[in-house]
């Protein structure tokens, strides 16, 4: 009679174990079994000279691997070297003019200006006296009206010359005006800016690789005359390599930034790459047709950017990738 309760107890224990195991299995499938589908997303960039000119040489061809800082091509430098020399000369002239403005006038120049005033004063005094005499002769009708007018004109011209000499002496003694000094300084700064631009233009006549990558296309050949910004090369950036994938709202909580995942390709199904979620879009969108999830194409999903941490040259632009979530992704 005692065996029946024991059997019932054992059955309850077994049933509880089965239920617990099933729940654990279900949870593990929910937490670790998420699979997404995406594509390799390698960035490309068009490289060009920032200035125009005739292509002098190109150092790389399609398929070549390039390194950041590597010289890829050069334009004819001669026009930019000439422009640089002209800009340097312009700075020298502007600097000299500015220095003169700051220094003011020399004692010799002031003395010459004072002598010019004395000379102009003597000439004016003579013309004024002559005009006074002519007025007396005109009253006695000894000279004609035309003679008197000529004397007045000579007197006025001498007076204008005297005033000009006096103004010049006054300026020499007081130095250059602040406005003139400011204008000379502005001219110098403009010349310096033109020099900096000329130096930059010469530098930009050499095309430098901005980062590591692989040359996809070579659009021009030596001898081609390019406008500024014309594409010379198209480069595929080898690092970083991303995978673009999409997750629905139901599984969004599993796709958190920093989460590690495994990435499988058709070429190596038994040797996954490792990745880490770097970005999750804050807004939902319809799944693009390129993603191989027919059952989700009508759903709203969130875009993921997964950085491949052990990428190699086997990963190509657009290659389909299976993204596997699970605890093993963080341990392999």
Swiss-Prot record:
Q: Which GO terms describe its cellular component?
A: periplasmic space
Q: Which residues form a coiled coil?
A: 141-210
Q: Where is the signal peptide?
A: 1-16
Query: Keywords assigned by UniProt?
Result: Coiled coil, Periplasm, Signal
PANTHER family reported in the protein's UniProt record: EFFLUX SYSTEM COMPONENT YKNX-RELATED (PTHR32347), UPF0194 MEMBRANE PROTEIN YBHG (PTHR32347:SF29)
What the record says about family reads: Belongs to the UPF0194 family.
Q: Which HAMAP family match?
A: UPF0194 (MF_01304)
List the protein's name: UPF0194 membrane protein YbhG
Native organism is Shigella flexneri
